[in-house]
């Protein structure tokens, strides 16, 4: 009997590799994840280094002039290290600036232009599709650790703050239908995510543009409304943390959900200032007394509520009296977590035309005074947690023990909870621990 040689196995060409540099806010990080998920589904591999990539994507930030400089520097580094670079993100709105600075760039697209980014990658490195190899998890690819994820619920913003150019970059508010948000959230939780960080430009305005329209999720109607969305997310069994909330009156409605433990008692509200005169110049809500009343009401309804906020010092026209007003307001408001920025002009912002520029040395001095003032407030509020048993989400474990976060700590921007000697834990574990020491930012606890 004669033997027949088996046909040679078909050899597939190596999958093209894409590298990415993601700059800016968590919302931009979500954009990067969506782009990578799409590319991975088409057979591309993700490279963790410049030299291993066939093309590099740089997702830029263009919010501040300093962020533009950082983005241009990152583009330059990618060109130097790899040479094949596609630019996307907020700075992509200024394609002329990018091409003037870096003419070697292969393509430039604007923010949340996913189709254009993917098409640009196709032009540079055509995809190699194989249905057996190009498997993507249903929750998509993420750039965060496995146990937490950012959930973007809308794009753009309807506010017109004079220091901000986001509406000119990302447009007016465009909310995602509630069923799409909930479907994504369910996939994330099913994949092991323990914490959902809800982000947008204005989270509390969610659904306004849709007129709170209903959509169907699991054969029942769900409304595109801030409270309804929080209620739905609170039933998924994961931590739900609310970021970028505007101090609208209807925020009061979510406080009971926090008191019931369905949503984390944590609000990230960028107040920006307290002086009515400065807030008016910023085109921000200027009723400082009503906001203080609202804060007191929130804490009465949910004593564990943690408030994070950001402020700007040195805004054009800010006087010493305005700044002292802000310090006094902080003493009364008792903000738990605070970030502060020295004002800097942003190309295209209306604030550039406001008279009374504050000298850089005065901005610096006020920044230090505010941070020192706030440190004492934060320290006292942290000390009040000593002796309390809290739930801790573990972020990292090494030979010294575990590092995690409580309800009061958002990743990257807030403090940590240290559990010394707890080396048997793993990332994503939720454990109970009693706080025995604190400083202005962090806590030390022993496992219960």
Curated annotation (Swiss-Prot):
GO molecular function (one): protein methylthiotransferase activity
Keyword line: 4Fe-4S, Cytoplasm, Iron, Iron-sulfur, Metal-binding, S-adenosyl-L-methionine, Transferase
Any Pfam family: TRAM_2
PROSITE patterns named in the record: MTTASE_N, MTTASE_RADICAL, RADICAL_SAM, TRAM
Single biological process term from Gene Ontology: tRNA modification
Chain positions recorded as [4Fe-4S] cluster 1 binding sites: 25, 61, 90
Binding site for [4Fe-4S] cluster 2: 157, 161, 164
Note describing how the cofactor binds: Binds 2 [4Fe-4S] clusters. One cluster is coordinated with 3 cysteines and an exchangeable S-adenosyl-L-methionine.
Origin: domain of life: Bacteria
Catalytic activity: L-aspartate(89)-[ribosomal protein uS12]-hydrogen + (sulfur carrier)-SH + AH2 + 2 S-adenosyl-L-methionine = 3-methylsulfanyl-L-aspartate(89)-[ribosomal protein uS12]-hydrogen + (sulfur carrier)-H + 5'-deoxyadenosine + L-methionine + A + S-adenosyl-L-homocysteine + 2 H(+)
Residues annotated as domain Radical SAM core: 143-381
Names of the cofactor(s): [4Fe-4S] cluster
Key word S-adenosyl-L-methionine present: yes
Domain MTTase N-terminal, first and last residues per copy: 16-126
Cellular component annotations (GO), alphabetically ordered: cytosol
Stored InterPro entries: Elp3/MiaA/NifB-like_rSAM, Methylthiotransferase, Methylthiotransferase_CS, Methylthiotransferase_N, Methylthiotransferase_N_sf, NA-bd_OB-fold, Ribosomal_uS12_MeSTrfase_RimO, rSAM
Family statement: Belongs to the methylthiotransferase family. RimO subfamily.
Function: Catalyzes the methylthiolation of an aspartic acid residue of ribosomal protein uS12.
Cited NCBIfam families: 30S ribosomal protein S12 methylthiotransferase RimO, MiaB/RimO family radical SAM methylthiotransferase
Protein name: Ribosomal protein uS12 methylthiotransferase RimO
Encoding gene, per UniProt annotation: rimO
């Amino acid at each position: 009997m004669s033997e027949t040689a088996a046909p040679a196995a078909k050899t597939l060409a190596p999958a093209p590799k894409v590298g990415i540099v993601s700059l800016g806010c968590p919302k931009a990080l979500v954009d990067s994840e969506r782009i990578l998920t799409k590319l991975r589904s088409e057979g591309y591999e993700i490279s963790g280094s410049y030299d291993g990539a066939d093309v590099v994507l740089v997702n830029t930030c263009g919010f501040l002039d300093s962020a533009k400089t950082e983005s241009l520097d990152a583009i330059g580094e990618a060109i130097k290290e790899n040479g094949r670079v596609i630019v996307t993100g907020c700075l992509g709105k200024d394609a002329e600036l990018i091409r003037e600075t870096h003419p070697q760039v292969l393509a430039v697209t604007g923010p949340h232009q996913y189709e254009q980014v993917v098409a640009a990658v196709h032009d540079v490195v055509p995809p190699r599709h194989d249905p057996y190899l190009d498997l993507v998890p249903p929750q998509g690819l993420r750039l965060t650790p496995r146990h937490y994820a950012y959930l973007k619920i809308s794009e753009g913003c309807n506010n017109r703050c004079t220091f901000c150019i986001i509406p000119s970059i990302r447009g007016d508010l465009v909310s995602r239908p509630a069923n799409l948000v909930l479907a994504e959230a369910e996939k994330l939780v099913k994949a092991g995510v323990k914490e959902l960080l809800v982000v947008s430009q204005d989270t509390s305005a969610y659904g306004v543009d849709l007129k709170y329209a209903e959509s169907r999720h699991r054969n029942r109607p769900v409304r595109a409304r801030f409270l309804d969305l929080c209620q739905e997310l609170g039933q998924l069994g994961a931590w739900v943390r609310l970021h970028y909330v505007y101090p609208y009156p209807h925020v009061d409605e979510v406080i009971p959900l926090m008191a019931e433990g369905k949503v984390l008692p944590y609000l990230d509200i960028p107040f920006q200032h307290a002086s009515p005169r400065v807030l008016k110049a910023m085109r921000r809500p200027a009723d400082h007394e009503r906001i203080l009343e609202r804060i007191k009401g929130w804490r009465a309804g949910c004593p564990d509520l943690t408030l994070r906020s950001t402020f700007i010092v040195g805004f054009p026209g800010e006087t010493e009296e305005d700044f002292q007003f802000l310090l006094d307001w902080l003493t009364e408001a008792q903000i738990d977590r605070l970030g502060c920025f020295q004002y800097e002009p942003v190309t295209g912002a209306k604030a550039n035309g406001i008279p009374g520029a504050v000298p850089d040395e005065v901005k610096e001095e006020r920044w230090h005074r505010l941070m020192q003032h706030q440190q004492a407030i934060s320290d006292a509020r942290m000390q009040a947690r000593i002796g309390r048993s809290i739930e801790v989400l573990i972020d990292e474990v090494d030979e010294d023990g575990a590092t995690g976060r409580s309800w009061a700590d958002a990743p990257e921007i807030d403090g940590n909870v240290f559990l010394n000697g707890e080396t048997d834990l793993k990332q994503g574990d939720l454990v109970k621990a009693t706080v025995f020491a604190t400083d202005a930012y962090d806590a030390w606890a022993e496992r219960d």
